[in-house]
């Protein structure tokens, strides 16, 4: 056996020290303590931030939501079946970001911005944070430009302005999604970009919506964000924020955008599930204490921003333009109960609500808008001039009709004035009916409202109101195309337009059939 003298031993040690690779990487790493139901508990992450992305082996990511004294609770974004106790978990120092930009228009993406429509990668897109602070009061501008939904009942009585938050609320299966989709279809030539966020819906339902948007030429102008019912609660919770970030891209660059959240009830349920699994204390209806903040921080991001904000954001690249993000959140009620926890929260956050009623829907009045309890708190200032002028008596007529109709059931004989009011109300109710996927232009709508407001429907049978309206619009678009184009472009109402519409309707009634 070879003997080593002390000098050789010291030389070997020196050589090893000289050749030692001492380059080290400082990182914050912990150990997975438990994995269950999409929730991971991690021990040993010292400097983790709230909402920070956490990396697990195999390219799986999570999001830190509970920062406790000796552990961190995180939700896994995606499949968690590969994770096991004892695995390492690393902090990334980043918060969740999603792709943004015009490359997303016409595409269907998941809650993390990955394309799921089979049309290939998105291309060169920027990314932006999912959680952002809403613009401050100083940077905002008042709402004074309209978003035309194409629905007579909405644009006449409950107008929506650019930068407004207008809630669509009602029971299941009474046309909430149909109304929102029609509003998106009506924007295809308006220059407003659209984002449709589907939360907790069946994939077949979403596929049908995408097909309808494509058939009506509106998909090229729309981003569809999907967190279906089969996906994790974490993705259903994040999808509205991801969609909002994609919409803010347009707002911050001086463009106008419209976002539909379908629906926030399912997002609240997903957040409740996450919170209960994270062992947070439950409150009313088992929702966590911050469920109001869940929706308020999302809906406050919908706003109209000033020219100065856009100029500052784009570093002077865009000047003299305001930007807006208009939100149409949808809430599903149970048996018409708007006093439940989530509906009351969202009603108090938004700038008005469109209330859809089951009884009206079942009696064939579609869209089933209850004009009495629906309201738009800021949209009046944004309403098109001609629609504002002609719609004044419509809401009153409907409100009086509903009141008198209930009274008339018990009264045997009615005086002449009451009978006329009832008949006028019936005709206006019939006129407010509208087919799905058939949004109306400003001129078409003005024509219908003019006929109702100026008494041209008095001698038309109630059963024939719909066919009268269709024939009238077709006649004007054929024989008075110049007048219709003028109304559509300017939206003004003056003596010349008044006289033109009046003469046209009189001639139509004298010469045409319906």
Curated annotation (Swiss-Prot):
Binding site for ATP: 170-177
Catalytic activity: ATP + H2O + 4 H(+)(in) = ADP + phosphate + 5 H(+)(out)
Key word Translocase present: yes
Site (Required for activity) location in chain: 374
Listed GO CC annotations: plasma membrane; proton-transporting ATP synthase complex
Superkingdom field: Bacteria
Family, as annotated: Belongs to the ATPase alpha/beta chains family.
Name this polypeptide is given: ATP synthase subunit alpha
Gene of this entry: atpA
């Amino acid at each position: 056996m070879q003997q080593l003298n002390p000098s050789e031993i010291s030389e070997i040690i020196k050589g090893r020290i000289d050749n030692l690779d001492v380059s080290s990487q400082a990182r914050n790493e912990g150990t997975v303590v438990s994995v269950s139901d999409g929730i991971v508990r991690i021990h040993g992450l010292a400097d983790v931030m709230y909402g920070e992305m956490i990396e697990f082996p195999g390219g799986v990511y999570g999001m830190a939501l509970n920062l406790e004294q000796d552990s961190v609770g995180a939700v896994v974004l995606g499949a968690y079946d590969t994770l096991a106790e004892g695995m390492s978990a690393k902090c990334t120092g980043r918060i969740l970001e999603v792709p943004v930009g015009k490359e997303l228009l016409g595409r269907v993406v998941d809650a993390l911005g990955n394309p799921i429509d089979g049309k290939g990668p998105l291309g060169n897109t920027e990314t932006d944070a999912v959680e952002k602070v809403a613009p401050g009061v100083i940077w905002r501008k008042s709402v004074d430009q309209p978003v035309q939904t194409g629905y007579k009942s909405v644009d006449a009585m409950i107008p929506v302005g650019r930068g407004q938050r207008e809630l669509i609320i009602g029971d299941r299966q009474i046309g909430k999604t149909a109304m929102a989709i029609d509003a998106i279809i009506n924007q295809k030539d308006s220059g407003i970009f659209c984002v449709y966020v589907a939360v907790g819906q069946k994939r077949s339902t979403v596929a049908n919506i995408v097909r309808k948007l494509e058939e009506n030429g509106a998909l090229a102008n729309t981003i569809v964000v999907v967190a279906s019912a089969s996906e994790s609660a974490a993705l259903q919770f994040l999808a509205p924020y991801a969609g909002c970030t994609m919409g803010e891209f347009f707002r911050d660059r001086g463009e106008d955008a419209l976002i539909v959240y379908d629906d926030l009830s399912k997002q609240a349920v997903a957040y409740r599930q996450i919170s209960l699994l994270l062992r947070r204390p439950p409150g009313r209806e088992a929702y966590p204490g911050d469920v109001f903040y869940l929706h308020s921080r999302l809906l406050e991001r919908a706003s109209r921003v000033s020219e100065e904000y856009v100029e500052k954001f784009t570093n002077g690249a865009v000047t003299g333009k305001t930007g807006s993000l208009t939100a149409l959140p949808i809430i599903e009620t149970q048996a018409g109960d708007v006093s439940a926890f989530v509906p009351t929260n969202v009603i108090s956050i938004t700038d008005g609500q469109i209330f859809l009623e089951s009884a009206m829907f079942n009696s064939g009045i579609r869209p089933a808008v209850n004009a009495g309890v629906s309201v738009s708190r800021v949209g009046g200032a944004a309403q098109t001039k001609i629609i504002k002028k002609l719609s004044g008596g419509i809401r009153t007529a409907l409100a009086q009709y509903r009141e008198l109709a209930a009274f008339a059931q018990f009264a045997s004989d009615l005086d002449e004035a009451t009978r006329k009011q009832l008949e006028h109300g019936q005709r206006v109710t019939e006129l407010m009916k509208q087919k799905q996927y058939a949004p109306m232009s400003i001129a078409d709508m003005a024509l219908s409202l003019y006929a109702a407001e100026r008494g041209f429907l008095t001698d038309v049978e109630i059963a024939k109101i719909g066919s009268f309206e269709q024939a009238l619009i077709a006649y004007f678009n054929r024989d008075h195309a110049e007048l219709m184009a003028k109304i559509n472009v300017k939206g003004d109402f003056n003596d010349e337009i008044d006289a033109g519409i009046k003469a046209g309707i009189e001639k139509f009634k004298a010469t045409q059939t319906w």
